[in-house]
Amino acid sequence: MTDGPRAAAPRFFPQHARHLLGLQGMHPTRIEPFLDLAESYALMSRSRKTPRDRLLGRTVINLFFEDSTRTRTSFELAAKRLGADVINMTVASSSVNKGETLLDTAATLNAMRTDLLVVRHSQSGAPALLARKVEASVVNAGDGTHEHPTQALLDALTIRRHFGTLHGLTVAICGDVSHSRVARSNIHLLTAMGARVRVVGPPTLIPGAIGALGVDVHYTMEDGLRDVDVVMMLRMQRERMSGGQVPSAREYFRFYGLDRKRLAVARPGALVMHPGPMNRGVEIDSRVADSDQSVIREQVEMGVAVRMAVLDLLSRAGDQS
């Protein structure tokens, strides 16, 4: 990858070749080559041989309207490993906090001649709106309860590294599905790749129409985790909840927390995943989070590799447009 001319960018993101806004509708024949590229970046990162000229002279702006140290840092590290100049903008330090509209921000960023724009926003659809207004390529780093595509891609890469494929696996996504953009992106990707997906949680945190996405719904952990290959726990997002959806953190853990007893009904060696940040003692027991079955730290590592691949491909797509 580090030698010779740069190849034309494969169109892994069919709806918006220059942007990554979501995973709905992405075809498996596009996902597998992307995961291959991300895997190569993971191997290069481990050997400290990343192509630092890949984004040389390019500017990446991380525009985060919501706090997220983990995701922002992952994108920043990915961009720097490819040689890009990186600027981090947060609401607290931007003109948005002084009344500037999103469209005003788009006009300002256009004037700056930004190459790649990584956006996190509390409102679903905000990255898509920016993508229509800016010349830069836009990456959705999480928008409201809509999607978080790079999280699902890194989850898929992590799973594939252990099983070799996603096809035929059974994955349980457990917890606060209603407020989770991670759950939605994973459902789109996993079902497209031939995995069977279950969603597990209290009725108050499972959307009524979720079955239309091709998933099975379970309201007890014992039923939902039986014979699954992967257990993906979700954070309880109290900041997005209305009152009364969950009685208390203690009650939630009592019925829906992942402990060793509940994990025992999954297949032997089932992977334990979590997008972070974890609430230990709420959705997951520390002994499970830190066990040999946990791949939570590996997810973080794969996140940098996936985001390197995304930034690389979108920069090449921008060259062709």
From Swiss-Prot:
InterPro entries to which the protein is assigned, alphabetical: Asp/Orn_carbamoyltranf_P-bd, Asp/Orn_carbamoylTrfase, Asp/Orn_carbamoylTrfase_sf, Asp_carbamoyltransf, Asp_carbamoyltransf_Asp/Orn-bd
A Pfam entry, by short name: OTCace
Pathway field: Pyrimidine metabolism; UMP biosynthesis via de novo pathway; (S)-dihydroorotate from bicarbonate: step 2/3
Positions with a binding annotation for carbamoyl phosphate: 70-71, 120, 148, 151, 276-277
GO cellular component annotations of the record: cytosol
Binding site for L-aspartate: 98, 181, 235
Keyword terms: Pyrimidine biosynthesis, Transferase
GO biological process, one term: 'de novo' pyrimidine nucleobase biosynthetic process
MF (Gene Ontology): amino acid binding; aspartate carbamoyltransferase activity
UniProt catalytic activity: carbamoyl phosphate + L-aspartate = N-carbamoyl-L-aspartate + phosphate + H(+)
Enzyme Commission identifier(s): 2.1.3.2
Coiled coil: none
Function recorded in the entry: Catalyzes the condensation of carbamoyl phosphate and aspartate to form carbamoyl aspartate and inorganic phosphate, the committed step in the de novo pyrimidine nucleotide biosynthesis pathway.
Binding partners and assembly: Heterododecamer (2C3:3R2) of six catalytic PyrB chains organized as two trimers (C3), and six regulatory PyrI chains organized as three dimers (R2).
Family: Belongs to the aspartate/ornithine carbamoyltransferase superfamily. ATCase family.
Stated name of the protein: Aspartate carbamoyltransferase catalytic subunit
